[in-house]
């Protein structure tokens, strides 16, 4: 490899120097907090001998002792040392694991409602048991949140053994669970589940009709694993329960066709697009893409072309907003969204690729029509638009908890955001063993081709000496390109991206074997440790698969749930034997890997977020193991292009730097770090902006869900309905009979408004417009209110009280849900439109808040009005239906009575009588006469046909149906 240029250059920007001075003067926040926490940790450690000396029954009984202390007025902080010490001893007896001092510190931080930053391999799963056990003693419920079902199930079974041993119950929330199972799981002291499932359960709970259908029981305390992924990366992605919406229009295809005719200009520098309108016009530029801001905007030239293409005069007119929206989404689909980076096309569907993990996000869709625009771009079926039934962001869901905490290996870079949005401090927990990973400076190349050549050279060199290598890429496309290059060099390797994710855990687990080479996108195994020398657990499972064990049994072999199933017990025995065997075998290999330098992490591009880069680095140097990390960059990388890559490339060309000659300089790394900080600040600003808008809807959601709960919990609505009647009539009278001159009154419209609900029967209700003209508006209002209440009172007397109360409840909930769904859509449209307006000095968020609450008030009025209408009309209709049903039942009873009274059914004219039918059979036959005629598959009628037994009945004979009439006047009249 060529000698690096400027290799001795060291540069520290003023900002970095300033921060270092601040740290020197005031000390590091985490270090100060750790000093405060250490005495609590010491108390826990001091109790070790006390609880170790206890018998099984004595230790188990400590849960009851601690609960009693809480009942007597002590707080969880008071009992923390004892609770942690009990849990620690229990873990040793049940799991064979004892919390290290640093893990106790991590547990204390979590209990205090903070974020514990703990490096990879430091045992976060075990750490969570300490605060979970302590807070589980309160009986209010603890939620331990993971990013997927696999981790939730694994941790609940594994750590559940400890909780059950100590007398606490555990629950598990996974996608396949039914409502009854969910309710039981939430009733447990400690519940494991994914962020998606918990959020969706909350939304579904606020759509139920009966409180017994709710599954959650409150939000007391949550411990969020991989907290940065859930609260930062997914903060902008709302949880949405959707229903079938309108059919997608052909505008998506038309807008896509238009977008393909346009000429685009891409900007990579913020300062390079000033005063560019003349340039756009001269070069026929139709739309501009700002890759840094991720926006696509039509130029004046593009606007004119759109008006010509769609045959409209002014694209910005309000009546053309729909066309404008579709065009904007089409140019965004073509200009911003990239195939195999932002999304993939699989089996005729567009599937989102998570920007932070590289995983496919099945079931998720881009909102505001962007997904349909991409479908049009890729030529796949454009799916129907959906209607939002309920929605919430993770930001607002997790802020429901009285106490929130989290764990991650990378949180410091987002410490400000955690504090500002969630009021969560980040405390860095020291590792149990010193980190031995060496982080080498970045190498920057002139071209991507030169960079990849050096990456492959590094991989080959490391592979030949037995050092395992994990190569991180930021897209599927790049991972596959590197894979082709390695194949040409004859290097055996594994590729892990969203297209080949089925064996993710196994590939990641074996990435630490001697000479292993793994190429992975950002998804590379959070939740699965890379162990030097190989992972004995996965080797044991592979061996069991060869022996013929089913996948189900192999899964159960590492489970911790209690069972007496012989097959499962045998599988566990086999696994334990194989696991022990492979652990011994890999010891020698692990030592060789350590001698080779440990795991070598190669980053092929910097991510927008330093945190994602740190996660990749953190795969190496686990639990004091050696390791190396290095990033290989080029001036053509996306991040470099956006922040001066072109200028850097020009400098390198002037210096005649070859494509494969790297520049290793602290200056470059600092420039990149600074660029990442700028992007992080921008993304924080975007998330903050999203939250400001969502807070408006969230406040409205709290009001609606709170009042909904009052209805569910059995609040008597009689007085509420009376108040609704008064408010509804007051609003309508003010609308049609406004203050001021009477010529502005519209009595006819007022009468039309009340038609069919207040004025149900004009003969009964004397609504004489001439008489009303002489009355005051206030008197008219009072008269209408009095009459409405009279109708309501009459309705109450028609049906049982419990029926009326149930109708009030169900109709009110139905109207709340229907109007809330429409309101969510209206708020979305308001948000989209408000950003297009120019308010001068006005803040768009303030305008959104004002208009949003005006719309909310209108929604409340609509709920009130529809509920009043239903309660004045429906009880009478229900009563009439009930009366009709009673009349039908009475007729049936009469028919049965007549049949029973008949002393003779069939006369056989002296012949032997056939067996007589019972009176009930006869009555049923009579009832069948009234049944409708159906048509069979061949078009023939399948109506009931008279089947006679014995001799034909004469026309003047008594009718055999038992009516007492002659046959010709009864059943035989049509013959």
Short names for language-model regions:
Residues 2, 6-13, 18-656, 705-706, ...:
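Conserved P-loop NTPase motor core
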Residues 51, 343-351, 357-364, 594, ...:
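Extended, charged helical/alpha-beta scaffold domains that provide interaction surfaces
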Residues 93, 329-338, 585-587, 734, ...:
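Flexible, glycine/threonine-enriched loop-and-boundary segments that flank and lead into catalytic domains
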Residues 211, 946-948:
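Short, P/G- and charge-enriched loop/turn segments at secondary-structure junctions
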Residues 466-479, 714, 769-773, 960:
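Short, Lys/Glu-rich amphipathic helical modules
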Residues 471, 519, 820, 856, ...:
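Hydrophobic, well-ordered secondary-structure elements that form the walls
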Residues 949-968, 972:
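Short Cys/His-rich zinc-binding micro-motifs
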